[in-house]
Amino acid sequence: LCLGIILGTSVLSMAQMTGKENEKLIPFGDFNSWMVRIIDESFVIGGNTKTLYEVAPVDTIRGDKPYISSTVSPWRTSNVMAKVSGVTKCSISVFPEKRDDGYCVRVETLMEKCKVLGIVNITVLVPGTIYLGQMHEPIKDTKNPQSKLNAGIPFTETPNAVVFDYKMETPGTDHRIKATGFSKIVDVAGRDSAEIYVILQKRWEDKNGNVYAKRIGTAIERLSENTPDWKNDHRLNILYGDPANQAGSKSYMQLIPKEQSLYCINSKGKSVPVEEVGWGDTDDKPTHLFLRVSSSYGEAYIGTVGNKLWVDNVRLAY
């Protein structure tokens, strides 16, 4: 709840007038503040020391302590610590990078390999992702990736657009790969794209703890072309209600299929899917905002190694 309050009120001090619109920087959305986690992986997989980065107040945390989220930053990354059968392994696909006098964020699609006593036995494709929400650490398996997240933050406003700076680098191949770690690596048809995914939901919970949602607003964009120079003040309009017949609508803006639902923590403290059941009406107001920036789109463990997206100054326009 405190993150929703931070986003909805305290950012007013960071608002800027641009033309007739008022822009609010999402807290820590200038990516100038990073927390560092230093974790020793288990000896049986090499015992390497890994550095994981999180968008949060400057700090250094040493040791394999689970990290859910910051109490003041709404962001979480796909940088994560896993513990499987007592073995500690880290995955790193999000990085701070210098930009002018500050920093930006780079998300990158990578291949993570795990060797046990020098023998390769697990290879996983990992897209770099930042999002608003939390992560349930330590990760214990690769099943149902969405259930590892508490996706979204409390939010009741209705912005016109998301605005950000970006640049992109991609190999530009017309196929992707799928590598889950426990099965054969296979080719997947189609070019990979980075994705900026923003939805506003009106959520509610029934007496049994099930959570449902109406989709209030949608703003999704896929980027698949090399953009070597920064594109500043890029605007992504939020479409309210069913976007099907609205300008800017895309086929991938539909409601989330039940089997791919986001997850949240219900009032009983249990991680449950958020089932989208319809589009919002004109009188509906959102209860939650979910924003995700990823170097690859679509299902987990699918993408093109080498996709890189740099993002900076993520804000909401009103």
Describe the residue ranges of each PLM region.
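Substrate-binding/catalytic groove segments of enzymes
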Residues: 174, 243-251
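Interfacial segments of alpha-helical transmembrane regions
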Residues: 180-186
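Aromatic (Trp/Tyr/Phe) and Gly/Pro-enriched flexible surface segments
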Residues: 16-159, 163, 189-241, 252-317
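Extended, low-complexity, turn-rich repeat/linker tracts enriched in Gly/Pro/Ser/Thr and Asp/Glu
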Residues: 168-175, 186-191
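Bacterial Sec-dependent N-terminal signal peptides
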Residues: 1-22
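A short secondary-structure junction signal
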Residues: 174-179, 208-212
